[in-house]
Amino acid sequence: MSKNKNVKETTKGPQAREAVFHPEFREDLRFWVKTDRKVALRVFELIEGVMRMPFEGIGKPEPLKYMLAGAWSRRLTQEHRLVYVVSNDRIEFLQCRYHY
């Protein structure tokens, strides 16, 4: 992982969006790598899915009603969710642990 506060990556394609990983998200991912690698791999699957199709696909994507505007979640486990915000040019990954 990079030492930058927000690690940025780009994808290729007609609607390429930049991926921004917030510090809390990176901390959550480190937790999964240390405690449950299967869940960590699921996080990477969901990231790939979100980057391809932010509003449909695996993990039962659903818009969040009571969080910030444009926030979506996908089911990571029965208890935990991956939360992200989609804008025109980027996808911000906010957290991947706990239920919102």
Model features per residue range: what roles?
Residues 1-79, 86-100:
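Basic, Lys/Arg-enriched alpha-helical interface segments
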